[in-house]
Each structure stands twice: as C-alpha cells, then as structure tokens.
Amino acid sequence: MVSVDFDAFTQGLGLTKYPFSVFTAEEEKEFLSDAFVRPLAYSPAVQAATSRKNIFLYGDRGTGKTALLFELVKASGPGSVVAQITDFSAIPITPSQSDIYSLYISTLANALLKRLLPTMAHFRRPYKLTKHDKVLISYLLQHHTSTLSRNALMDDLRSVQHHRMKRWATSTFNFFRSLLNSAAGAAVDMLSETVSKSLGLPQPTLGGAKEYLQAIDLSVDSTLDEARANLVVLQQTVALCKKVGMESLTLVVDRIDEDSRLRNDSELIADFLRPFLTENDIFYQQDLHFIFSIWSVPFQKVKPDFRSNKFCLEQVRWEPDELLNILNKRLELHSDGKIVAYAQVVDDAAIFREKVLPLANANPRDLWQLMNRIIREQYAQDSTSHVIKVAAMESGIRRFVKEFTFFEYYPRKKDARANSLDVYSYIAHLNKLADIRFTTNSLNAAAGTGSSTQNYIVSMESIGLVRRCEEKGPNGSTLYEIRDPKVRFAVENNLEIRRDA
C-alpha cells in the first residue's frame, strides 16, 4: 500500500491546517474568537455581563468554561477593567471572609497601582487625591503588593504622600550631605588641632567622616487602622478605583479546583469554595462585578448553601448537536471553508454519532483528543483514504480510552506514595464489574475490596468518578453508577485501563 506523509494525508481529508493538536482555550486564544460556538449558557450569561450582574459558571472539566469566560470579559465593554484571580496560594485552605476580602483587595490593588504609578510623580495629575486616598494607597502598597522591592516601595510611598518640591529639596540636601559633613568635619578637626597644640594637649584621634548633619528622612504614615474590617478596605479600594477612572471593575475567579493544596479532592475544594460563595456581602457592591468559573463536582456540594437565585447561575454543558456544531465550525475554519460538516470526513456519520460522540464526555476538549486519535488511526491503517473509516473509528476509540491520561481530570495527590490509591487504582476495581451500575456489595463481590469498599466509593464520589443514583438498588441499597464515559466503555467492553498503557 502506498504511504504518504501525515500532512499530505490530512490535506487529502480536505484540511489545510490540522485542527486537533491543541486542546485548551489558553493555547489558542487568537483563534478562539473565530472558533467559538455559543453554548446554551452563553446568551443569559452575556446579557448578565452587559448589565453588570454577577455570573457563576459551573461545569465539568473540559466543557469550555475558560473560553466562555474570554467571551464574557469582552462583553463587559471596552471601558471595563478586568482582573483575574487564578492563584490562591496567598490564603489558607480554610479561608475566612477576611482572607477572601484580602485576596480581592490585593488583586484590585495591583490593577489600581498600574493605573496610578505612571502619574504619581506628575505635578498635575488627572485626578485629585485626598489625604485619605494617599494613606489608603500607602496601605495597599505596604500590605497588598508583593512585586515591589522595599526601596521601590518607599519611593512610591513618598511620591504619594509628599509634595514634589518637598521631595526635590530633601533629595538635593541628602545628595550634598556627605560633602557638607566632610567640610564641617575638616573645620572642626583643624580647630581641635590648633587648640590642642596651644595648650600642649595630646592630639585628638582623627577618625572617619563624622555625621554633623543628619539625613532628612520623609516619614511615611503607615498607621491606617488595620483592625478595620477588610470589607471596608475593599469598599474603599473600589471607590478609589472609580475615582481614578476605573469605572467598570470585574473580578474573574477561575481555577479554584487547580490549587495543588486541595489535591483534586472535591470535598476539600468544596470546603475551600464555600466561603467564597456564602454570606458574601461584597456581591452586593454596586461598582464591583464578579465572574466565577467552577468545577461542577464541588459546586454541587456547595450549591445548597449558595443563594443562587440572586445571581446569574449557568451550567456550561454541550448537548450532542451542539458538540457537532462546534466540530463542524472547527473543521470549516481549518479547511478554508471546504468542510462544513463532519459527515464529509467520516465514512459513516451514524456510527460516528452513536459510538464516537458519547465518548467525548459532553465536552469539546475530549472530542478534540478523540478526533486526534481517530485520525491518526486512519493514517496508520490507510494513509491514502480521503475519509475516516469505521474501523479507524472503532480502533481509535479503544486506543483513546486505553491511553487517556486520567490524571488530567483526576490528578494524583501531590504527596502521594508510590503504592497509594489514585484514579487508576479505582478504575482497576471498577473494571471488574459486570455493569456500570453497582452497589457496595456488588463492588465488593467483583473486586474483593472487603471492608474498604465503602471508603473507596466515597473517594470515587469525591473526585467525580462515580455518582449516587436517585433510584435504589436491591433491598433498598444505595445504587451508584460510573460517571466517566471512558470508564463506562471500558467496563462494557472488557477493556483494561492501566497507568502504564
């Protein structure tokens, strides 16, 4: 059989560029606007963004929450100021409201100082700062910034708190101070020597330069009452932002579940997330707008405590037809418009919908990885084909499931021992089931997990691998089912998933 290189093969499919080599919104920001297809959550969320309402997006990993965030930020308007929070290491894993407000203050402080610092030394600023404003800025510089050195910090504080002429006179004096000290020292030494000689006294010891004139130091008022509630400081920071022209403030809170301290444990993530969402008075601050992006598994644990009816709450998920639309759009963009539907590149569209699409787990990221595997299987089987055959789809699915990096969605704990349980250990137990639904007893009978069975189930629930069914099992027992379609496929097709595959 004649073989061609991979580029020639994909061109034979009708593609001008390969569309399945990157899998996250961050990796293709420039292309994202053209490729973006609106999920059901888009319309209500974008309306909320334009009307400055708080938005809370939740969904499974890979569903495109970050891509939707980018679109919502653009919908906030050209004059809006957006600050993103993706690093939570500055606050404890059991944060208080004060910790969270402090995180918000620090984030806004960085945005505020970027606006202020270029004009701090100007004789005429485009805004007038009161004494209270200056003290607040000084407080933010001292307590809510981490990138400025101590010397630069003090320079910035002086720029804010002292008049330009006063700073110039002080720096001029301090510059000539060493010369003045030397001159004064020489005069005093000469006088001392003359007096000593005339009186027949021992000569005085001549030391180094003496500090006859002390340096003038511009004091900094750092006495802002730190006992005041961080909420008040946050409100004052928002007001100051507005005063200097930062009218539309948006805080985007994303990737809470990716904090390594939380070990990908949905219970820990939920405990960390809860104070962000509950009893949070700042959500009612008129001049500050929030957009949250949250993994659905921990969010469902927090949702009963969250007054969601007061805000825009949208689940990001994709129905099969929506996934096909986004696939079609991607193929069209990477074929210069020659491919307008997936059916043009597959041999059997019905098989694709029935067997391939469900494995995508209702999210674009998995679909791109699945398509990548299927196309490569077709290349390996017949690189001269201009369509993807059913055999390539079937073998591509199996390789996709076997070789999928489950740590992407269920990462190994940071401090885990080599022999500790992880997602592959749990899948190995589930692999022994005869059905994707099970009870504690049926899992124990199949996998021999013994007295640890219930602990395993709790752990699998915690990471989102399995879920509890609404209906009951035999004799009223609790019934569970496997959530991940890849693991479901493995159980139904007796396919072993191994860490070293």
Residue locations for each model-derived region?
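Winged-helix-like regulatory helical subdomains adjacent to P-loop NTPase cores
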Residues: 2-6, 358, 362-451
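Walker A/P-loop-proximal flanking segment of P-loop NTPase domains
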Residues: 1-98, 123, 499-501
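P-loop NTPase nucleotide-binding core
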Residues: 60-246, 465-466, 475
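Short amphipathic alpha-helical interaction segments
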Residues: 447-463, 468-469
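Short, Lys/Arg-rich nucleic-acid/phosphate-binding segment
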Residues: 470-478
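Short, amphipathic alpha-helical interaction segments positioned at domain boundaries
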Residues: 478-501
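The catalytic "switch" region of P-loop NTPases
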Residues: 2-8, 222-224, 228-352, 359, ...
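Conserved AAA+ ATPase small/helical "lid" subdomain
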Residues: 126-146, 331-388
